[in-house]
C-alpha cells in the first residue's frame, strides 16, 4: 500500500518521514520503501513568457523571452505553438537534468542562443502528452520550482500491511495509527454533501436475496453529471498511489477507496434495467462480461449485483461492462455495500480475478463505513462533474454486522508482557485506537471494538494493541528465573537410539516406510506373523490398503526395489510401529493394538571387494552378529533356539528368548516361498525384534565393573558334538565353571574327517579369579572340569 505523506498530513500532523517510517515499523506496519517525488525536476521552474517573435533562420521555431523570477529575462528558442505571451510554462534552466536523462546546456539553435528549454508534460515525465508546452495555472509565480507549482513534491511510503489489518489499507486507517502513536486526534474528511432534486428512492430500488453473503447494500443517485477528465490534483494523488486516472466519476470512487478504505462502484443508471438492483447468487448457466473485457461463466456460489434482466457486477470483485460509466453517462448509481469476506474470496480465486476492491473485501471491510464512504463519494462526484445528488439513501440492510465486546482484566497485560502496565496507560491507548470503554467491575473492563477492527476478538488482542503502542522495545530484558532443565529421556527413546547406533555400526542404513502395505504382502509371512492386517476405509492405493502387522514386508519390498536398481548389497533396518488385531486375553478395550518393532534385512556380500578382502556372501552368522551387537547395546541376555518361525528357513533360523522365557523375536534366512513371493533370491536374511520385549529385559543403566588388575589365563578347546547340539548349549555349560570370565565361539567345522551328523566347535575361554592370580594348575583343573562336563552332558569328544 502506497501512502502519500502530503495526503496523510491532511488528517494528522506528521513528524519527519524517517521518524514516521521508524514508528510505523515498530507497531507492525513495515515500511518497505521511502520515495521522494519532485526531486527529479530540480532546476525546472515556472517562467512567464514576456515576449515571442519568429526565429530569423527557421520557420518552425520561435525566440521567446521569459521571466524566470531571476531579474533579467532569458532568451529561449522554442518549437511549440500552443502558447501566448503571458502564459506561465515550465522552464528547464541551464544545468537541469530531465527525467529522460537529457541535460540542459546553453546552446545556439540556427544561429540564435538559447538559455534553457520550455517543456511539455511528456518532457517532465508527467504524462504522454507532447502536443505542446505544459501551460501552468495563471497565478503561478515565476521562479517557483515546478515541483511546488504542480504539487509534485511529496514523500511516498510503501507500507506492508499484514492480512489481518484491512483497516490500514487507506490513508485514514494509517492516520488512526499515527494519531494514537503521537497522542493526536484524527481530522476525518467531511463529506460536504449537498442534496437536491427528487428522492433517490424514486429513482432506484434495492433488494437483497442473499443475506448470508451481503449484509447491507446502500445506493445514492447523482444526476446531471458530465463525464470528463479529473482535475490534476486528484489524478496525481491516484497515480502516486498506483492507480491510473480514468474519468472524474471513476476516479472519485478510487479516491474514496484510498482515503477511507471502503470499495465503491459506480453504475450508469440508465443502463440498469428497470432501475432496480437485486443482490443475488448466479443462476445456472449465467455469464457476465466484466470490465476487463472477459466473458465469464458463473457458479451458483458467485454473488451478483444484478438488474431486472442480467448481472451487472461480480459483487465485491469487479463491475460488468454492460453498465459501466461511459462518456455519455449523465446519471450515476453509486454503490456502497458490505459483502461477506469468504464469498468474495472464493469468487476472486475461482475466476482468477484480483482487484483493489476484492483485496479489501476478502480481508474484511468496515461495516460502519458503508454510509460515510457513500456520502463522501457522492459529494465528490457532484463537485467534479457538476451533478446533483438526489435526496436520501436507498439502504437495504439484511442483517447487522455487530462488533464484539471484549472483556479485559486489568492485570492481564502485566501477566502476558512481564512488565507493569498501569490502568491509565492501558485505557488511554485503547481509547486512542477507537475502542469504547463500557462496563467495568473493578478488576476488569469491557471494551467495544470499533467496527473497522476485524482482527480484535479476545483479551490477548487488546493486550497486543497496548504493547504495540507502548513499543515492543519497552519490554525489559530479563533472564529466565528457574534454570532450564532438559527433560529426562524415556527408556524407549534411549533404547531406540542405542539400537540405531548398533545397527548403523554394523553397516545398516535406516529405512522409513509407510505404515500401510498391500494385503498380498502379508500372506507369505503367515507362518509366525499375523496375516490379517487392519483394512483402511479410504486407502491411498491397492498397494497401501492395510496396516502392516510387521515391518518385515516393507523391508523386503525395499530390498527387491534395490535389486531392480542393480544394487546387490543391501543392509536395511527400520524401527517403527506395527499394527494388528488384539489377541484374546490381552489388556485393553480397543479391537487392535500397536507395538514398536526393530526389523532388518541383509543380502549380498559381507563387505566390499578390495585387494585384501574377498567377495564372501553374508550368511546367518553375519545377521546374528548384527543382532548380537544390538542386544549387547541394550544389555539384553538372550537364548537362541532353532528353528525360527515358519516364514524363515527351518535349517538357518533361530528364535530369541529372554532368560525368563519371554519371546524377543527371530532371525534367519527367508523361507524359499517367501523369497519367491517378494522376487528375491535365496539366501536373504531378515530379523524382527519386539522393542517392548527388549525393554523389559534390557539393562539400560550401565553396571560398574572395575578394570581387572589381575592377569587372565587363556585356553582353547575344540569338541566334536552332534549336529543337534547348539553352540549356545555348549557355551552355557562352559559358563557354569565359576572361574570362566568369557567364552567366544571362533570356529564351526563340518566334513571329513568328521563322521556325518557331527560337527566341531572351537571355543576360546578366558579364566580369571577376582582376588588372586590363577596358577596354571588351577586353570588346567578348571579346564578339565569343563571338558568332563561337556562329555557327560552333550556327549562331546575332545578333539586333539
UniProtKB/Swiss-Prot annotation:
One of its GO terms (molecular function) is phenylalanine-tRNA ligase activity. It is an enzyme of class 6 (ligase). Its EC number is 6.1.1.20. Keywords: Aminoacyl-tRNA synthetase, ATP-binding, Cytoplasm, Ligase, Magnesium, Metal-binding, Nucleotide-binding, Protein biosynthesis, RNA-binding, tRNA-binding. GO terms for biological process: phenylalanyl-tRNA aminoacylation. Residues 38-147 form the tRNA-binding domain. Binds 2 magnesium ions per tetramer. Residues 401-477 form the B5 domain. This is Phenylalanine--tRNA ligase beta subunit. It comes from Anaeromyxobacter dehalogenans (strain 2CP-C). The lineage of its organism: Bacteria, Pseudomonadati, Myxococcota, Myxococcia, Myxococcales. The gene is pheT.
